[in-house]
């Protein structure tokens, strides 16, 4: 019987162990998509407690606690203390066997705080106090955490109207780790509620210093902000969409639709789809002009619990996997850009695992030989960011594409304690490849190439792909 989470955790063969310990483990981290708060990095924020850094904003843990019968006040409530919240989390942890939260929890305790104890109600107070004592020191600040995990580059997620002042301040402070912005223009496509859209466009007008009275003005304002993001080092965009949009439209129609929504009138479903379709193309062309990589996270049904959405807002643990027939629209969208010669580097992330093979085959349609892996199948996202989800994504990409050209893992996280997800991914990758070698499916004579492949997927592919 193996010990829990020892040095060979998830590594079932000697070859897997060699690949991980001698190659994957030493690679720096490039976290090219995350949701860290840039101000915390700029301020080198010091966390007040383990609860703040671990439970604050972590909807994964909140979902588990709710499922375990924990009252909402211990998840998101203002009236309960940090210790009370942590105590309820510690009571929940023993019920998370086989959930990735169990592994993440103990991997984070071990790698960040050097704690090998299992978290449960009996150990909760001891672990809480030990972690809080360490968090009070400078080496456990926001920047200290990034250094601890050998992070080289992070890309945050930022709205076109964000000032990026914290990215600038961080860079000018001389901080050795790169923090770059990512262009996330979702709100310019959110035309379902006229008043919300107009409010957003007015903010875009203000920060761009361009008076917006029609569709062309809006595009000019977006281009100005796009240029500004590029000046601040941005190399990626990101789009959170339910599904792909590829309706037929004319520019005249889109101008009319803009006037209608900006004037306060609700759009028909057809008009909404046409506008979203047009914006995806325009934004894709902007990214192509700059040589950026566009990312698409699709397939989530968000804010399912309307009562809790009204109470807590978005991103609080009430989203789930959607079921959308989007392959044709995805193909049509990519083909439109490709036909114009304006399809930039692209990463596709699905939330429904049923689409693994869809994406793994779709990306092969638009590889053009200009660079290795120009169109990428993104790492297992959100609910698929776990051992089984990672393995299924890696296997689909291996069978239908080129795993060796994969740009690898990202945290997609708001937490400074989420970097062990890179370790988890690397261990999973090394275990798959190690088993293949020992099963005679990859020749032992090619071991040097396999070792390089592990280092590439862990670090070098992303470094070269994004030009960091």
From Swiss-Prot:
Could you confirm whether the keyword Isomerase appears in this record? Answer: yes
Q: What class of enzyme is it?
A: isomerase
**Reactions mediated catalytically:** D-glucuronate = D-fructuronate; aldehydo-D-galacturonate = keto-D-tagaturonate
Please state the Enzyme Commission number of this protein: 5.3.1.12
**Keyword list, A-Z:** Isomerase
* Molecular-function annotations in GO: glucuronate isomerase activity
**Cross-referenced Pfam families:** UxaC
NCBIfam families to which the protein is assigned, alphabetical: PRK02925.1
What family classification does the UniProt entry report for this protein? Answer: Belongs to the metallo-dependent hydrolases superfamily. Uronate isomerase family.
The name this protein carries in UniProt is Uronate isomerase
- Source gene? uxaC
């Amino acid at each position: 019987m193996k010990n829990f989470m020892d040095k060979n955790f998830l590594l079932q063969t000697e070859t897997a162990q060699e690949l991980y310990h001698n190659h994957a483990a030493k690679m720096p981290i490039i976290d090219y998509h995350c949701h860290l708060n840039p101000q915390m990095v700029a301020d080198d924020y010091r966390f007040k407690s383990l609860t703040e850094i671990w439970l604050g904003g972590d909807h994964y843990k909140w979902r588990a606690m709710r499922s375990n019968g924990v009252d909402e006040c211990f998840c998101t409530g203002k009236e309960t203390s940090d210790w009370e919240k942590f105590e309820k989390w510690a009571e929940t942890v023993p019920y998370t066997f086989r959930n990735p939260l169990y592994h993440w929890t103990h991997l984070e305790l071990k790698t960040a705080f050097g704690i090998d104890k299992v978290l449960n109600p009996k150990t909760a107070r001891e672990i809480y106090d030990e972690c809080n004592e360490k968090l009070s020191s400078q080496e456990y600040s926001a920047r200290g955490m990034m250094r601890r995990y050998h992070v080289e580059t992070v890309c945050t997620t930022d709205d076109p109207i964000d000032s990026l002042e914290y990215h600038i301040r961080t860079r000018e402070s001389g901080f050795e780790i790169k923090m770059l912005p990512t262009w996330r223009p979702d709100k310019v496509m959110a035309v379902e509620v006229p008043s919300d859209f107009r409010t957003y466009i007015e903010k875009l007008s203000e920060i761009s210093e361009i008076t917006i009275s029609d569709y062309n003005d809006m595009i000019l304002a977006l281009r100005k902000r796009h240029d500004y993001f590029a000046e601040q080092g941005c190399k990626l965009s990101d789009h959170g969409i339910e599904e792909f949009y590829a309706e037929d439209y004319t520019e005249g129609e889109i101008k009319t639709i803009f006037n209608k929504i900006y004037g306060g009138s609700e759009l028909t479903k057809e008009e909404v789809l046409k506008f979203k379709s047009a914006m995806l193309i325009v934004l894709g062309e902007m990214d192509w002009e700059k040589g950026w990589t566009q990312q698409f996270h699709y397939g989530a049904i968000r804010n399912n619990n309307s009562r809790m959405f009204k109470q807590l807002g978005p991103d609080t643990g009430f989203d789930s996997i959607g079921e959308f027939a989007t392959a044709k629209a995805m193909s049509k969208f990519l083909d439109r850009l490709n036909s114009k010669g304006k399809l930039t580097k692209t990463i596709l992330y699905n939330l429904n695992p049923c689409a693994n093979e869809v994406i793994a085959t779709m990306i092969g349609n638009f590889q053009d030989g200009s660079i290795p892996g120009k169109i990428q199948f993104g790492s297992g996202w959100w609910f698929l960011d776990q051992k089984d989800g990672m393995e299924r994504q890696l296997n689909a990409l291996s069978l239908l594409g080129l795993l060796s050209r994969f740009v690898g893992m990202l945290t997609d996280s708001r937490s400074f304690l989420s970097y062990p997800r890179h370790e988890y991914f690397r261990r999973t990758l090394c275990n798959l490849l190690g088993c293949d070698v020992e099963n005679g499916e990859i020749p032992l004579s090619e071991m040097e190439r396999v070792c390089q492949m592990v280092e590439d997927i862990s670090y070098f592919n992303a470094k070269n792909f994004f030009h960091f």
